[in-house]
């Protein structure tokens, strides 16, 4: 008899715990498919070398060679988790700034302001026709929200 009581008690406990986890976890910014993109969890951020070259060329108004565009789009499409694509573009952009020693409000390259490079990088998924999710459920082609306005990007 006591085994039945323990069994039912554990069952009720698990149901309550699962319900609470779903309720509170769904509202957490640390849960969801984007949380799998965190390097601390073992995710390997893509260098996006082709996109790096494409964004630099576009920002200064140069023609982007077809091979560079193709490389960038393939590298972006190769990121299996759609939720990680904008984050990887953001990491790529930060590494460009670091490489060039860019400070806030400065030109990244001659004729290319930082804000323009941010918007150029944010639009790469649209240029490449590579799907990315956004919070509204649409599969917009531009990195969503205020990504391009973040001061650290």
Swiss-Prot record:
The effect of residue 95 to A is: In 50% of the molecules
Instruction: Write the signal peptide boundaries.
Output: 1-30
List S-S links within the chain: 37-84, 51-72, 59-112, 73-128, 86-143
| Pfam families named in the record | Tryp_alpha_amyl
Q: How is it modified after translation?
A: The disulfide bonds are essential for the inhibitor activity.
Tissue pattern of expression reads:
Endosperm.
According to its record, what are the GO cellular component terms?
extracellular region
Keywords (alphabetical) are:
Alpha-amylase inhibitor, Disulfide bond, Secreted, Signal
Tell me how this protein assembles.
Monomer.
Q: Which family does it belong to?
A: Belongs to the protease inhibitor I6 (cereal trypsin/alpha-amylase inhibitor) family.
* Function summary: Alpha-amylase inhibitor.
- The entry's protein name is Alpha-amylase inhibitor 0.28
């Amino acid at each position: 008899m006591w085994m039945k009581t323990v069994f039912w008690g554990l069952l009720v406990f698990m149901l309550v715990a699962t319900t609470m986890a779903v309720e509170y976890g769904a509202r957490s910014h640390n849960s969801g498919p984007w949380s799998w993109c965190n390097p601390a969890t073992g995710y390997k951020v893509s260098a996006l070398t082709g996109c790096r070259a494409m964004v630099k060329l576009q920002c200064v108004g140069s023609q982007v060679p077809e091979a560079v565009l193709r490389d960038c789009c393939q590298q972006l499409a190769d990121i299996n988790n759609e939720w990680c694509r904008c984050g990887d573009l953001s990491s790529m952009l930060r590494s460009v700034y670091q490489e060039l020693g860019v400070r806030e409000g400065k030109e990244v390259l001659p004729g290319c302001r930082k804000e323009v490079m941010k918007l150029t990088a944010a639009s790469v998924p649209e240029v490449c026709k590579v799907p990315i999710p956004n919070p509204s459920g649409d599969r917009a082609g531009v990195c969503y929200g205020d990504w391009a306005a973040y001061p650290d990007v």
